[in-house]
């Protein structure tokens, strides 16, 4: 049995959970999330806790047990507190700004790159170089942050590009001249 899957998921007061079979809907102050879980697990609710249990001892049920528990816990966390990813833009002339809901990134190309957020995701820019991606869905927030980082990944020689806040870029030595 999965150690992660054994833990009950506590529900905050403002969060409402409904499940029909393997589809689960979680509503909270930050939004509403829906997901269909894979076969092999069952969900049960007891007062302020959700329990995820494998339906049998087959390998697939055991594999999905911890995964489904983590997915449901992330949904509950997302609709109550939300998730954020912070990115830093490093380099002369590289900057970002928000126009309407669209993020416009100038990253050294001949044209600015526009990123349109999916529903529920918001972009915020601080000091033209720090981008904050927020939303209730952990997977979507991470995917959008990865898309923004992929516009200009950090290069190892000078460290220019778009990186996650706190990300360590391994630097390489440049060419050594003739002596």
UniProtKB/Swiss-Prot annotation:
InterPro entries: Ribosomal_uL6-like, Ribosomal_uL6-like_a/b-dom_sf, Ribosomal_uL6_a/b-dom, Ribosomal_uL6_bac-type, Ribosomal_uL6_CS
The UniProt record lists the keyword S-adenosyl-L-methionine: no
SUPFAM superfamilies: Ribosomal protein L6
Highest taxon of source: Bacteria
Keyword terms of this UniProt record: Ribonucleoprotein, Ribosomal protein, RNA-binding, rRNA-binding
Protein family per UniProt: Belongs to the universal ribosomal protein uL6 family.
UniProt protein name: Large ribosomal subunit protein uL6
